[in-house]
Protein backbone atom coordinates (compact mmCIF):
# COMPACT_ATOMS: atom_id res chain seq x y z
CA UNK A 1 0.00 0.00 0.00
CA UNK A 2 1.45 3.36 -1.02
CA UNK A 3 1.95 6.09 1.54
CA UNK A 4 1.86 9.82 0.85
CA UNK A 5 4.74 11.94 2.04
CA UNK A 6 2.42 13.91 4.31
CA UNK A 7 1.08 10.77 5.98
CA UNK A 8 4.57 9.36 6.35
CA UNK A 9 5.92 12.46 8.05
CA UNK A 10 2.93 12.99 10.35
CA UNK A 11 3.15 9.69 12.23
CA UNK A 12 5.34 9.39 15.35
CA UNK A 13 8.91 8.23 14.86
CA UNK A 14 9.53 4.50 15.19
CA UNK A 15 13.26 4.76 14.50
CA UNK A 16 15.79 3.18 16.89
CA UNK A 17 17.58 6.49 17.47
CA UNK A 18 14.34 8.42 17.86
CA UNK A 19 14.91 10.42 14.69
CA UNK A 20 12.05 11.78 12.64
CA UNK A 21 11.54 9.92 9.38
CA UNK A 22 12.91 12.90 7.42
CA UNK A 23 15.93 13.54 9.68
CA UNK A 24 19.55 13.00 8.74
CA UNK A 25 22.01 11.59 11.23
CA UNK A 26 24.40 14.16 12.77
CA UNK A 27 26.60 15.16 9.84
CA UNK A 28 29.98 16.89 9.61
CA UNK A 29 32.80 17.51 7.14
CA UNK A 30 36.33 18.09 8.44
CA UNK A 31 38.57 19.47 5.70
CA UNK A 32 42.34 19.20 5.57
CA UNK A 33 42.33 15.98 7.58
CA UNK A 34 45.57 14.67 6.07
CA UNK A 35 48.74 16.54 5.17
CA UNK A 36 49.80 15.38 1.73
CA UNK A 37 46.72 14.99 -0.47
CA UNK A 38 45.60 17.97 -2.54
CA UNK A 39 42.20 17.58 -0.91
CA UNK A 40 41.16 15.58 2.15
CA UNK A 41 37.97 15.38 4.17
CA UNK A 42 36.80 13.27 7.09
CA UNK A 43 33.04 12.89 6.67
CA UNK A 44 30.94 11.77 9.61
CA UNK A 45 27.33 10.64 9.17
CA UNK A 46 26.29 9.42 12.58
CA UNK A 47 28.61 6.52 13.39
CA UNK A 48 29.75 6.15 9.78
CA UNK A 49 33.14 7.81 9.29
CA UNK A 50 34.89 7.95 5.91
CA UNK A 51 38.21 9.53 4.98
CA UNK A 52 38.07 10.97 1.46
CA UNK A 53 41.25 12.16 -0.25
CA UNK A 54 41.71 13.73 -3.68
CA UNK A 55 45.05 13.30 -5.46
CA UNK A 56 46.07 15.12 -8.64
CA UNK A 57 47.95 12.96 -11.15
CA UNK A 58 49.50 14.64 -14.17
CA UNK A 59 48.42 11.87 -16.53
CA UNK A 60 45.25 10.36 -17.93
CA UNK A 61 44.21 6.78 -18.78
CA UNK A 62 45.47 5.54 -22.17
CA UNK A 63 42.06 5.95 -23.83
CA UNK A 64 42.18 9.71 -23.12
CA UNK A 65 45.73 10.49 -24.19
CA UNK A 66 45.94 13.34 -26.66
CA UNK A 67 42.26 14.27 -26.34
CA UNK A 68 42.84 17.33 -24.18
CA UNK A 69 40.54 16.31 -21.36
CA UNK A 70 40.94 14.86 -17.91
CA UNK A 71 39.48 12.06 -15.84
CA UNK A 72 37.93 11.64 -12.41
CA UNK A 73 38.03 8.19 -10.83
CA UNK A 74 37.67 6.65 -7.39
CA UNK A 75 38.73 3.78 -5.18
CA UNK A 76 36.81 2.59 -2.11
CA UNK A 77 37.78 0.35 0.76
CA UNK A 78 37.03 -0.50 4.37
CA UNK A 79 39.52 -0.83 7.20
CA UNK A 80 39.60 -4.38 8.61
CA UNK A 81 37.82 -3.35 11.82
CA UNK A 82 35.42 -0.80 10.34
CA UNK A 83 32.58 -3.16 11.29
CA UNK A 84 31.63 -5.26 14.32
CA UNK A 85 33.93 -8.11 13.30
CA UNK A 86 37.29 -7.94 11.58
CA UNK A 87 37.37 -8.50 7.85
CA UNK A 88 40.45 -9.36 5.83
CA UNK A 89 41.98 -6.61 3.74
CA UNK A 90 41.08 -7.11 0.11
CA UNK A 91 44.76 -6.71 -0.77
CA UNK A 92 45.49 -9.75 1.39
CA UNK A 93 42.80 -11.73 -0.44
CA UNK A 94 44.28 -10.72 -3.77
CA UNK A 95 41.08 -9.33 -5.33
CA UNK A 96 38.39 -6.76 -4.78
CA UNK A 97 34.87 -7.88 -3.99
CA UNK A 98 32.05 -7.17 -6.42
CA UNK A 99 30.58 -4.78 -3.85
CA UNK A 100 33.80 -2.76 -3.67
CA UNK A 101 34.03 -2.50 -7.45
CA UNK A 102 30.39 -1.44 -7.72
CA UNK A 103 30.77 1.27 -5.06
CA UNK A 104 33.95 2.80 -6.43
CA UNK A 105 32.45 2.94 -9.92
CA UNK A 106 29.41 4.68 -8.45
CA UNK A 107 31.61 7.26 -6.72
CA UNK A 108 33.53 7.95 -9.93
CA UNK A 109 30.36 8.26 -12.04
CA UNK A 110 28.79 10.58 -9.51
CA UNK A 111 31.76 12.96 -9.46
CA UNK A 112 32.18 12.93 -13.25
CA UNK A 113 28.54 13.96 -13.59
CA UNK A 114 29.38 17.42 -12.22
CA UNK A 115 32.79 17.93 -13.87
CA UNK A 116 33.64 19.49 -17.21
CA UNK A 117 36.51 17.15 -18.00
CA UNK A 118 37.81 19.39 -20.79
CA UNK A 119 38.47 22.16 -18.27
CA UNK A 120 40.41 19.74 -16.08
CA UNK A 121 43.07 19.35 -18.76
CA UNK A 122 45.03 16.14 -19.31
CA UNK A 123 45.24 15.16 -15.66
CA UNK A 124 43.44 12.74 -13.37
CA UNK A 125 41.70 13.52 -10.11
CA UNK A 126 41.91 10.28 -8.12
CA UNK A 127 39.57 9.99 -5.15
CA UNK A 128 40.25 7.49 -2.38
CA UNK A 129 37.41 6.76 0.05
CA UNK A 130 38.46 4.71 3.06
CA UNK A 131 35.81 3.68 5.56
CA UNK A 132 37.17 4.01 9.09
CA UNK A 133 33.91 3.02 10.78
CA UNK A 134 30.76 1.70 9.15
CA UNK A 135 27.20 2.09 10.40
CA UNK A 136 25.30 2.15 7.11
CA UNK A 137 25.41 4.56 4.19
CA UNK A 138 29.14 4.32 3.48
CA UNK A 139 28.80 4.79 -0.29
CA UNK A 140 26.60 7.84 0.17
CA UNK A 141 28.95 9.40 2.71
CA UNK A 142 31.86 8.67 0.36
CA UNK A 143 30.24 10.56 -2.52
CA UNK A 144 29.31 13.52 -0.36
CA UNK A 145 32.77 13.77 1.20
CA UNK A 146 34.64 13.07 -2.03
CA UNK A 147 33.04 16.07 -3.71
CA UNK A 148 34.39 18.39 -0.99
CA UNK A 149 37.86 16.82 -1.26
CA UNK A 150 37.69 17.26 -5.04
CA UNK A 151 36.65 20.90 -4.65
CA UNK A 152 39.67 21.55 -2.42
CA UNK A 153 42.00 19.87 -4.91
CA UNK A 154 40.60 21.95 -7.77
CA UNK A 155 40.91 25.14 -5.70
CA UNK A 156 44.60 24.33 -5.14
CA UNK A 157 45.15 23.78 -8.87
CA UNK A 158 43.55 27.13 -9.62
CA UNK A 159 45.61 28.84 -6.92
CA UNK A 160 48.78 27.42 -8.49
CA UNK A 161 47.72 28.66 -11.92
CA UNK A 162 47.41 25.14 -13.31
CA UNK A 163 43.74 25.68 -14.16
CA UNK A 164 42.26 28.77 -15.78
CA UNK A 165 38.63 27.84 -15.11
CA UNK A 166 36.88 25.77 -12.47
CA UNK A 167 35.87 22.40 -13.99
CA UNK A 168 33.29 21.73 -11.26
CA UNK A 169 29.86 22.66 -12.60
CA UNK A 170 27.74 21.74 -9.59
CA UNK A 171 27.74 20.00 -6.24
CA UNK A 172 26.87 16.32 -5.87
CA UNK A 173 25.75 14.43 -2.76
CA UNK A 174 24.05 11.17 -1.90
CA UNK A 175 21.80 9.69 0.75
CA UNK A 176 19.96 6.45 1.44
CA UNK A 177 16.24 6.04 1.95
CA UNK A 178 14.24 2.94 2.68
CA UNK A 179 11.07 1.30 3.95
CA UNK A 180 11.31 0.24 7.58
CA UNK A 181 8.23 -1.21 9.29
CA UNK A 182 6.15 -0.01 6.35
CA UNK A 183 7.38 3.57 6.54
CA UNK A 184 9.69 5.58 4.32
CA UNK A 185 12.71 6.86 6.27
CA UNK A 186 15.78 8.93 5.41
CA UNK A 187 19.47 8.11 5.96
CA UNK A 188 19.37 4.54 7.25
CA UNK A 189 21.87 3.34 9.82
CA UNK A 190 23.04 -0.27 9.88
CA UNK A 191 20.25 -1.48 12.18
CA UNK A 192 17.60 0.00 9.89
CA UNK A 193 19.36 -1.12 6.72
CA UNK A 194 19.45 -4.70 8.01
CA UNK A 195 15.70 -4.70 8.64
CA UNK A 196 14.37 -2.63 5.74
CA UNK A 197 11.91 -3.91 3.14
CA UNK A 198 13.37 -1.62 0.47
CA UNK A 199 16.71 0.13 0.21
CA UNK A 200 17.34 3.02 -2.20
CA UNK A 201 20.54 5.02 -2.67
CA UNK A 202 19.99 8.39 -4.34
CA UNK A 203 22.65 10.64 -5.89
CA UNK A 204 21.69 14.19 -6.88
CA UNK A 205 23.33 17.41 -7.95
CA UNK A 206 23.12 20.65 -6.03
CA UNK A 207 20.65 21.98 -8.58
CA UNK A 208 18.29 19.06 -7.92
CA UNK A 209 18.96 16.75 -10.87
CA UNK A 210 19.22 13.01 -10.35
CA UNK A 211 22.55 11.35 -11.09
CA UNK A 212 21.70 7.82 -9.99
CA UNK A 213 18.94 5.94 -8.18
CA UNK A 214 19.78 2.44 -6.92
CA UNK A 215 16.75 0.73 -5.44
CA UNK A 216 16.01 -2.85 -4.44
CA UNK A 217 13.34 -4.70 -2.54
CA UNK A 218 14.82 -6.67 0.36
CA UNK A 219 12.61 -9.74 0.40
CA UNK A 220 9.62 -7.53 -0.37
CA UNK A 221 8.25 -5.21 -3.03
CA UNK A 222 7.39 -1.53 -3.05
CA UNK A 223 4.90 0.55 -4.96
CA UNK A 224 5.35 3.58 -7.20
CA UNK A 225 3.78 5.70 -4.48
CA UNK A 226 6.26 4.43 -1.89
CA UNK A 227 9.14 5.07 -4.28
CA UNK A 228 7.92 8.63 -4.84
CA UNK A 229 7.76 9.15 -1.08
CA UNK A 230 11.31 7.85 -0.65
CA UNK A 231 12.60 10.06 -3.45
CA UNK A 232 10.91 13.06 -1.84
CA UNK A 233 12.70 12.32 1.42
CA UNK A 234 15.99 11.92 -0.46
CA UNK A 235 15.58 15.28 -2.20
CA UNK A 236 15.11 17.02 1.13
CA UNK A 237 18.06 15.22 2.70
CA UNK A 238 20.40 15.93 -0.20
CA UNK A 239 19.47 19.62 -0.14
CA UNK A 240 20.66 19.67 3.49
CA UNK A 241 23.88 17.83 2.60
CA UNK A 242 24.65 20.24 -0.24
CA UNK A 243 24.20 23.16 2.16
CA UNK A 244 26.65 21.46 4.54
CA UNK A 245 29.14 20.99 1.69
CA UNK A 246 28.96 24.64 0.69
CA UNK A 247 29.22 25.84 4.28
CA UNK A 248 32.28 23.62 4.80
CA UNK A 249 34.00 25.24 1.81
CA UNK A 250 33.39 28.81 2.96
From Swiss-Prot:
One of its GO terms (biological process) is tRNA processing. Its EC number is 2.7.7.56. PROSITE patterns: RIBONUCLEASE_PH. Pfam families: RNase_PH, RNase_PH_C. Keywords: Nucleotidyltransferase, RNA-binding, rRNA processing, Transferase, tRNA processing, tRNA-binding. It comes from the Bacteria. The keyword Transmembrane does not apply. One of its GO terms (molecular function) is tRNA binding. Homohexameric ring arranged as a trimer of dimers. Belongs to the RNase PH family. Phosphorolytic 3'-5' exoribonuclease that plays an important role in tRNA 3'-end maturation. Removes nucleotide residues following the 3'-CCA terminus of tRNAs; can also add nucleotides to the ends of RNA molecules by using nucleoside diphosphates as substrates, but this may not be physiologically important. Probably plays a role in initiation of 16S rRNA degradation (leading to ribosome degradation) during starvation. This is Ribonuclease PH. It comes from Bordetella parapertussis (strain 12822 / ATCC BAA-587 / NCTC 13253).
